[in-house]
């Protein structure tokens, strides 16, 4: 552990400032696009599932729940994404695998719609001639803001913190997100610490505790989240409380 306060770890990260800022930019793009698409798809699936008059509603609800129990496996997924969709070393490597919607999020949003939006609103809108999509756009989405912000926060954190897809599908440094880049930095520092005579790094880095590097990298990775979260906290708390009333 560090024996005294120092900024050597941050200086090491700052030496790669251009790469770090490029990774930040790519991560922000992935997070914004991925979160927006996730919110649209999740709400479009949860909305009809919340309607009591949906034909076959029990089957579709069970179908969504069933996907929580099983996974297709890593190897089939890797073959599918790299051979059929050809996402290797592209921005889609961070987007498409994560856009396989979370059944938990769908159930959470569906439950919120069922328990927080009165049936009388649906009936009044239908009497006035509103289509189901109009109801979704003008009633469901505005009233569902707390749960949508909550799911958006979940999805945004997922896209921001994702490094496994970068590990599987990306080997070009120009396409590293901040998490993938910082993970590579940790691996480089660990290798240098384990083999101090085999690298060309400075003596300060060789003697620098890897814990210092890990903590500095963790702070750099989480800093944008710390800035954004206070503005979303009230929606997060209310969305979780209301969406989890009953399943």
List where the protein language model places each region.
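A hydrophobic, multi-pass inner-membrane permease signature
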Residues: 1-247
């Amino acid at each position: 552990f560090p024996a005294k306060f120092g900024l050597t770890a941050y200086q090491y990260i700052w030496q790669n400032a251009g790469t770090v800022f490029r990774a930040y930019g790519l991560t922000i793009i992935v997070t914004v696009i991925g979160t927006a698409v996730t919110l649209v798809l999740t709400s479009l699936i949860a909305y009809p599932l919340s309607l009591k008059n949906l034909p076959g509603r029990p089957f579709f609800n069970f179908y969504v729940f069933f996907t929580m129990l099983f996974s297709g496996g890593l190897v089939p997924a890797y073959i599918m994404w790299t051979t059929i969709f050809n996402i290797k070393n592209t921005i889609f490597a961070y987007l498409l695998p994560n856009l396989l919607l979370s059944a938990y999020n769908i159930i959470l949003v569906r439950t919120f719609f069922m328990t927080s939006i009165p049936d009388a609103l649906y009936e009044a809108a239908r009497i006035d001639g509103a289509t189901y999509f109009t109801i979704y756009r003008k009633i469901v989405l505005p009233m569902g803001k707390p749960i949508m912000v909550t799911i958006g926060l979940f999805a945004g954190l997922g896209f921001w913190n994702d490094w496994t897809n970068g590990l599987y599908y990306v080997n070009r440094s120009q396409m590293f997100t901040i998490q993938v880049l910082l993970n590579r930095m940790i691996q480089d520092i660990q290798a240098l610490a384990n083999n101090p005579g085999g690298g060309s790094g400075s003596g300060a880095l060789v003697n620098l505790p890897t814990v210092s590097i890990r903590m500095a990298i963790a702070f750099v990775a989480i800093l944008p989240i710390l800035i954004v979260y206070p503005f979303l906290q009230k929606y997060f708390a209310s969305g979780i409380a209301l969406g989890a009333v009953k399943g």
